[in-house]
Amino acid sequence: MSQPLAPSSQLWQARAHAKVNLHLGVGEAREDGFHELATVFQALDVHDVVSYRWSEDITVEVTGRHAKGVPATTDNLAWRAVELVAQRLMLPATGILTMEKNIPAAGGMAGGSADAAAALLLANHALSTEFSREPVTEEKLVELASELGSDVPFTLMGGTALGRGRGELLTSMMSRGRYIWAIITNAEGLSTPTVFHKLDELRAAGRGSSPHLDTEAVGQALISGDPRELAAALHNDLQPAALSLRPDLRKILDTGEAAGALKGIVSGSGPTCAFLCEDEETACEVVAQVCADNRGTRSLVATGPASGATLV
């Protein structure tokens, strides 16, 4: 195969944005093991920085405040994204991939999926440029994103979107205004499959709510641009399961709302809790109070909507 004799050692970078689920309705388990979802995603401005430099060797590095527990190996989903792009370009999957983790790991904010989406974009741009290849089309990148995981297509797209199927079938949604979130992270993560399994158990025992698949209230609230209206529409079918597995999250939610948040929800499968606030000052008060009253928590203030994976 033809390729330049000496590809450059240029460093390429992309931002990988976190997400919050404004609505997460979970249907019954399908034959393939996945659950049918009706979810409304919104991208947040908190982001990881994913870097790639071509090399004949393979190196995966993880740095940053939330690096703990993230595999610095070729098992990392972001490296799998590099491999998929390299295969499409008929190139060897080698190089140095680095993730600076600012998104909590195993926190229900799609940090791993966001890194994979950024790696898709990054590898496509870097490798096609370095080796003078026709880049993978945008349509094909979306297909690769879906192959990698349910949240990867949205973290590639960004903005605000309705997700159906596993969450990978996306429709962009109108969203007026800017929404401010107080995000509370936890040192101990929650496994997404474990939370879904717990929801199935609760429903089988008659203790889980029926699937809430209607997203109209959230859609209308987003069009209004009123954070109070959006707060009233926030919903997560997985929240009872997450609270059953981690009762300590209930105190976090209660503390945040008592401190002035319009509404607090478990983000995705948890354990991260997201509090919608009327303004940044209130968000700062919420994170200060929650962290003071709950050991082992960390915090950040984020806004949405934000872009998807972005080259820098």
Language model regions located:
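Solvent-exposed alpha-helices and their adjacent loops that cap or buttress functional pockets
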Residues: 4-6, 42-43, 146-147, 153-156, ...
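Conserved hydrophobic/aromatic beta-strand scaffold that supports enzyme active sites
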Residues: 13, 49-51, 160-162, 181-183, ...
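Short, conserved aromatic-histidine micro-motifs
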Residues: 57, 134-155, 286-304
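Conserved, helical-rich catalytic subdomain that frames metal- and/or nucleotide-binding sites
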Residues: 157, 162-263, 278-284, 288-291, ...
